[in-house]
Amino acid sequence: MYKKILIASLALIAGLASCKKDDPTPSPNPPSGLTIDGVASTLEFYQLDTAHLSVAGVAKDAAAKAVWAVNGAKAAEGATFDFTTAHPGKYEVTLTVDGKSAKHTYTVAPRFSEGAFLLNEGNFGNETGSLTYIHPSKKLVIDQAYYRVNGTKLGNVCQDLAFGNDQIYIISQNGPKNGGEGLLTIARSNSLEKVKVYNDETLAQQWPTHIAVLRDQIYLRTDRNGIYRGTADGGFVSIPGTSKAKKLRMAQIGERLFALTSDSKVLMIQGTQVVRELDLSPAKPSGIAVSHDGTLWVSTTSPNAILKVDPTPDNFVALDTHVLDKSISSGWSATSAFFAHGDKLYFTGQSSVIYCHDFATSKTSQIIDVKTIDGVGTSANVYYNSLGVDPATGELYYAAFEDYGTYNKKNVTMVLKADGTKLLLKEKVNSFPAGFYFIPNAASRTGANR
């Protein structure tokens, strides 16, 4: 399995290793002669990185009989040892040769504190959902990230996730099928280490598709009975007046949750009640997101437009509307028709062409047709929840595949600058994309699922 790990292995050779000032001095000091080659001092690296270690200071035949142990447990024999782990923590690596020992302590840091996740539905018939981790500045992509950390699989047809309480909440539509664990998976957001898996057959029958987390409350939008509220321990109860909630991402501001409906409304939900409704008729809502100034962006078709909406209960109205000359339809997508960075809103109309509408200047421009990017071509034939935009950096994310018969063999995932310049491109790391999600970090981010 590890041959397929798409990571940049950390070569821990003495001349290149960087020491942390607050690291303790290794103790005890190794006896004269025997050393662990490939280290300079106690080092910090990340989950799934690899430290390539070897025996030094003894004869070749003696080195071949070396025994390596990690935290006191035998891990390998021989002159070399590749140390890797999926879990953060401190690890003492001990080398023993002919009764002599040398030791080093490693601090393994959480891998997933920044960057983005691509959630994948997986094939309904024979797969489960999965997470692909992306860090464009490090040119790093790790497919099957949750599985690599936990050794278990997400539920069948994962369609949405949310961040909250330093955790990541992943909802699957069909729960524990095809070897997947469950309906709702909760993991530590910075390490992906499993916290809890929740299953509820009754709730699963409602086909949950989208999730939002407000403090300890979990909101689930379902196909069959609108929006439910509960906790990680269960107790999910349907919220009256939400039965027409659309199969699209929701947005949150403070204690209020916002959802779109099939009868052209924006619902404002607080607690277990719909406290306000904004009627957009005859327009049809196609996406919603929190703006950088704390208001709401809402897109519609018939007409194609972008609205800025006041999210306060006392003035729940559209403040401004820009009509577009391009389609901003969400089609069959379950994410949103658009994604925003500042006053710039990016959309595709379910195509391979990315457009940008600048709300400050009222101008719409074409950024790029991703099919024209070297290495893409027909691998971007099918738009399937393909677009994402990092709300902090403005970088564009795009994942697509050639056709439904070869989705797992001919697909592409990429990151672009805001002008369409390619930053990163990987093949075969998506499987029916469910959308991109950007990890909350020191840069303040707002809104559900961002």
Regions found by a protein language model. Give the residues of each.
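Conserved beta-strand positions in repeat-built beta-propeller and related beta-rich domains
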Residues: 116-126, 170-179, 213, 220-224, ...
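A short beta-strand motif characteristic of beta-propeller blades
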Residues: 140-153, 193-202, 234-241, 273-280, ...
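Solvent-exposed loop segments of extracellular immunoglobulin-like
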Residues: 59-67
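Surface-exposed, flexible coil segments in extracellular/virion-facing regions
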Residues: 67-84
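Repeated scaffold domains used in trafficking and secretory/extracellular systems
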Residues: 151-162, 203-215, 244-254, 282-293, ...
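Bacterial Sec-dependent N-terminal signal peptides
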Residues: 1-44, 99-116
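A short beta-strand segment in extracellular, disulfide-stabilized domains
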Residues: 46-59
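Acidic, serine/threonine- and glycine-rich low-complexity intrinsically disordered segments
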Residues: 228-352, 357
